[in-house]
A protein has these predicted regions:
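Polytopic membrane enzymes that build or remodel cell-surface glycoconjugates and lipids
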Residues: 2-483, 503-506, 510, 517
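C-terminal luminal/periplasmic domains and tails of membrane-associated envelope-modifying transferases
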Residues: 306, 419-664
Length: 664
């Protein structure tokens, strides 16, 4: 039975609808983790000009250009990611179709009446399952990871254009391949090895002699070298070393487990990543979502004799050598299978460029390496009846699509993404599985921000137990305990955080707040004073914190009798916020305590006329008391109590003033 001419269009429509069904429910997902580059000015403040070449100029710049074209709305940016994903699927289909057309299958398969339709159906199923694979969600649904999706699109197009150039003999195709390669590298540096694929593609399509192979290899390596040299100018301080403070801290944790590891981090990272090649492949071939999250933490090898890592690394080398040998010695489906294996094996080399200890196993990077899987699947399935293939493909697509939809839902917000990641962390893993604290730390921060203090404290304690770096977990646990008014426990947590290396104005501020709440005003004043004097980052949030610190410093100065300091602080605050009632009350009380009651009343009277609040009446009562006007003081205190009947301080002060005045 001949295939209908409408079948390809029907398959395209089904695939597009299936992909949209997976990703459209996530269009309103919030920005997550690395997505913060989109909101903190990193991307929109530095990208958007093709004349100013930066890392990922094209992919990051596309956010700026798309916003200028379509306006604000993260859903528009997400929809563009989905469009890129569909573009990748189309490019993969075009590349593999061109390669399959060149491939001779066993004679008994080629003699089948449905051979061509079976081959096309097998490829369609392979591309469709790639499109719906839940592992792809971490590239497509994670907004800022557009870089790897765009790099994959141009890398595959470069390979396809090169193949078409070899098949047609037209130089324009080769020029297009070179342009697409440049665009791929400008999208993300992980595509740099795409040029190396020219050699296996040429060997597969032309079966050249050794002299020609050497010439093509030289040209391909020269192109890779040029691109690598450009990237070295950008990433030179990253290559072969631990490149950020968090990674350095994790390396020190490993050093504590086995002295000498820190000096061997680079070769151990190569060993680790070579073994993880198979873990990535496993998650794409058997995409069980229970093994997936944004923060996976496999053990880092402490030596070169680690059995699992050694077996994985030897397996990677054996697979690379075997695929190269098979490509050179075999034609037909075995040669194509070898070629498909060489795609991820060669692209994966960028994993060996630096020390991956902070993010050793992240699924979005694997999107590029997975594009050859549809080719391998097409080889296996070709020969089966097309009807059977479409039925099996539909069932598999429904299963994968459902799992992918669940992964999209897991990326809805910080709460879902870090809850999911925390669930996937093995708390009983060996201690060299460093970095496991991060999901719990971030989940605790999410709960703390929303006032779920018990949950936040619990997550912070788990993070601390799993080796959190620098005392962050202990500090945040202290903040959660402080908000629950468990101030002694909070102070113990702050002390533990400081012991683990946490420092800065925030630590002194929060410790002083708990001291103040416990009535230890001298310690509180010293804490606020230290926080004010300690330099911090120059940001809007830090500047706002400085205002809060100055106000609390003034409060503590007033409580400890440092009246000149209190007055100075309150006056400085009033220059910034002249109508701040709380600051006016503080200044009035400080002036009254200095005996400047006339000046104090000149603050309180218009304040009460404008905004008759309980603190204002209380402050004026203090001024009246210092002025010896007991009846007015008691009257204002009564008014303050009526406005805030639950305030124990007002009642205690009234009893004190009444006793000193000899009145009930």
């Amino acid at each position: 039975m001949a295939e209908s001419s409408k079948t390809p269009y029907l398959l395209i429509a089904v695939l597009v609808l299936a992909v949209l069904g997976v990703y459209l429910p996530g269009l309103r997902n919030e920005l997550l983790f690395d997505d913060m580059r989109l909101s903190d000015g990193t991307i929109f403040g530095q990208y958007g000009s093709l004349m100013d070449l930066r890392p990922r100029t094209l992919s990051y710049g596309s956010f700026v250009w798309l916003q200028k074209l379509l306006g604000d709305g993260w859903w528009k940016q997400r929809l563009f990611n989905v469009g890129l994903h569909l573009g990748v699927c189309a490019a993969v289909y075009a590349l593999l179709k061109a390669l399959l057309a060149h491939t001779r299958f066993p004679q008994d398969i080629e003699e089948q009446a449905h051979f061509t339709r079976s081959r096309d159906a097998a490829l369609c199923i392979g591309v469709g399952l790639f499109a719906l694979n839940p592992a792809a969600v971490y590239a497509v649904g994670y907004l800022v990871q557009r870089s790897i999706v765009m790099a994959t699109l141009f890398a595959v197009l470069a390979c396809w254009a090169f193949v078409r150039g070899l098949q047609t003999g037209r130089a324009a195709w080769h020029a297009g391949a070179l342009a697409c390669y440049a665009l791929a590298v400008l999208s993300k540096e992980h595509a740099v090895m795409t040029a190396a694929m020219a050699l296996p593609l040429y060997i597969y399509l032309r079966r050249p002699g050794w002299k020609t192979i050497a010439m093509v290899a030289t040209a391909a390596l020269l192109l890779v070298a040029v691109a690598a040299a450009v990237l070295h100018g950008i990433y030179g301080d990253v290559l072969g070393r631990v490149f950020d403070p968090r990674s350095a801290a994790l390396a020190q944790q490993l050093e504590a487990l086995r002295p000498g590891v820190a000096a061997r981090m680079y070769p151990l990272s190569i060993l680790n990543e070579a073994a993880l090649f198979f873990a990535y492949g496993l998650l794409w071939v058997f995409p069980y979502v229970g093994w997936m999250s944004v923060d996976l933490r496999p053990p880092f090898p402490l030596g070169f004799a680690s059995p699992w890592h050694l077996a994985g690394a030897l397996g990677y080398l054996a697979l690379l050598a075997g695929a190269a040998w098979m490509l050179l010695r075999r034609t037909g489906v075995l040669g194509l299978a070898a070629l498909c294996l060489l795609f991820p094996l060669l692209w994966y080399w960028t994993e060996f460029a630096t020390v991956w200890v902070q993010d050793p196993f992240v699924l979005y990077r694997s999107y590029l390496w997975a594009v050859a899987l549809p080719g391998l699947l097409a080889i296996v399935l070709t020969g089966f009846h097309p009807r059977t293939l479409y039925i099996v493909g539909a069932v598999a697509g429904l299963v994968l699509g459902g799992m992918a939809l669940e992964r999209v839902a897991s990326l809805r917000d910080d709460g879902t993404v870090w809850s999911d990641a925390a669930e996937k962390i093995n708390r009983d893993a060996p201690p060299n599985a460093v970095g496991r604290s991060r999901p719990f730390l971030n989940l605790g921060a999410y709960h703390l921000e929303r006032g779920a203090l018990d949950q936040a404290t619990r997550e912070f304690i788990i993070a601390d137990a799993l080796g959190d770096l620098g005392g962050n977990a202990r500090f945040n646990a202290g903040v959660a305990l402080q908000q629950q008014k468990q101030h002694e426990a909070a102070l113990q947590s702050f002390a533990a955080a400081q012991t683990k290396g946490f420092s800065g104005p925030l630590l002194h501020y929060h410790r002083a707040e708990s001291e103040f709440a416990l009535g230890r005003y001298e310690a509180a004043f010293n804490g606020f004073d230290t926080a004010l004097r300690e330099p911090g980052e120059d940001s809007e949030s830090i500047r706002r914190m400085q205002l809060t610190l100055r106000q609390r410093h003034a409060d503590a100065a007033l409580a400890t009798g440092r009246l000149d300091t209190a007055v100075s602080d309150f006056r400085a605050l009033l220059k910034i916020s002249p109508q701040n009632a709380r600051v006016q009350v503080g200044l009035g009380i400080a002036l009254a305590s200095q005996g400047k009651t006339t000046e104090a009343l000149a603050i309180f009277n218009p304040l009460i006329a404008r905004s008759p609040s309980a603190p204002a009446f209380y402050g004026r009562a203090v001024a009246y008391h210092h002025a010896g006007r007991a009846p007015e003081a008691l009257k204002d205190l009564d008014q303050a109590i009526r406005l805030e009947p639950g305030n124990a301080q007002y009642r205690a002060v009234r009893e004190q003033f009444a006793a000193s005045a000899g009145k009930p």
